[in-house]
Amino acid sequence: MRGRGGSEPGNIETLKSLERLLKRRVTQRMSMSWFAARAMACAMLAAVGRSFSLAPKARLARPLCAATMDVGVEAPPRLKIKSIVEAEAPESLVGTKTVIKGWARTVRAQKALGFLEVNDGSSFGGLQCVFEGEAALKELKAVSTGCAVAVEGEIVKSGGKQAIELKAETLEIVGGCEEGYPLQKKRHSLEFLRSIAHLRPRTNTLAAAARLRSCLAQATHSFFEQEGFAYVHSPIITASDCEGAGEMFRVTSLSGDALAKAATKENGFEDDFFARSAFLTVSGQLSAETYACAMGDVYTFGPTFRAENSQTSRHLAEFWMIEPEMAFATITEAMDNAEALLKSTISAALDKCGADLKFCDQFYGDKELLDRLTSIATGAPFVRLKYADAVDVLRAEIAKDPSKWQFPDVEFGTDLATEHERWLAETHCGGNCVFVYDYPRTIKSFYMRDNDDGKTVAAFDLLAPGVGELVGGSQREERTDKLEAKMVEFGLDPEDYWWYLDLRKYGSVPHAGYGLGFDRLVCYVSAIENIRDSIPYPRYPGSATF
């Protein structure tokens, strides 16, 4: 096929000459900006196009100006924004050529300059990119909040509040953002953000919570590895009720009439998938105990489920638990380990998530969060208080003005409410965490070891300022006869726990453990009050949208 301006070979040679010219201009880094070079290339292409046309197979899939810029040019390495803005000496990066990729947070264009803040999620703060020149500003106008972009340029000293910024040389819109994007530059309520849980990690609050959650999870694994614990994966589907409360989600493949009949018959689920009743686990503790009685010190860390119809800001239907179990251990050693874990994980958050914590302190912590966390991580040992003594001090305090309390009736055998727990930690113990231990046996679980007084069990709760109960643990009952008797007392069938009783028959040892509500830990460290905002996709009564 012949072009209007000459033969096909001549056309191709002209294109090759144009390509060589543009390649030289890019590789030599001429003074013109990329945006100006791109504009020049487009103009040259238009001029060439007026003189000839290409055969169908030779047509370019995209504009020559976009295709040619990468020819023979090695792109600089991509850097995560965290490695730039949180570098120990950001000024040392001045002169570095790099590419950043992320999402546009803010876009501002002036007469001679344009500013684009890009955040890639690796850090709280984004990186400001500066655009100069008419061509660059024209490109920038195509970017809106929420667009995914890639920006290549050189790190330079900033004339603004930040130490450095990126002087943009190229801009690519990787993914555009349609009108109606719900996360415009304004403050949104946490309740609204739960309705768009798939987009809310792009906000400051939920991104900070997610990074803190990641940091705390990694710190948890690091702590137990250093302490010599083995990580055990406990089953999600179980036939046992660890808590004996019966608030469990049933797992079944039956439906309709078959399910209705099975629920009313003894052994009615023998035709079900598992040939018996099965549930989502409420705890990995019982499974962890079996491994502790073979491997010494172990822990589980995973999701657990409870079909409790609770709409409070402290409860979820699906939540994560850290559950260590230690063989040849007593309640004292369990409390020691829980204290060390909490101090270690909080220290890691303070060390690695400073910007996120400062944000949380400003918007959720009443400017006291950092001080409180530092005090917990590096301050005095946690207070230890017997339950009976806790009841005494509470009764004395409540007697001063019962009207100030939602639950003023406290006596031995009362299951402490959140207001009681918080007063003990925040006021009575001066803002320190406190272990309350030796609880009445009637309000604790069947597997907890009876004390010699016959009234209490070797159980503890760790109460933290601001949240109340954070950890619950105990020394486990290792005596077969007493454990079996308590099962009957609590309305459980020992036959359902035959394997758990076997641990006491074959080489039984004293052992202890605890459970730490991981989502509550995230709330405690971030000062975010509602537990539904501590987890990516919260599950609670009436809500499993995503």
Task: List PLM regions with ranges.
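Class II aminoacyl-tRNA synthetase-like tRNA-binding/catalytic domains
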Residues: 72-329, 523
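N-terminal chloroplast transit peptides
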Residues: 30-57
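N-terminal plastid-targeting presequences
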Residues: 63-70
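Intrinsically disordered, low-complexity basic segments at termini and long loops, enriched
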Residues: 1-37, 417
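Short coil/turn segments at secondary-structure boundaries
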Residues: 182-184, 213, 230-237, 293, ...
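Metal-assisted phosphate- and nucleotidyl-transfer catalytic regions
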Residues: 241-268, 340-464, 486-509
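Generic, well-ordered alpha-helical scaffold segments in large soluble proteins
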Residues: 103, 215-227, 283-286, 290, ...
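TRNA-recognition modules of translation machinery and tRNA-sensing kinases, especially anticodon-binding
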Residues: 275, 279, 292-303, 312, ...
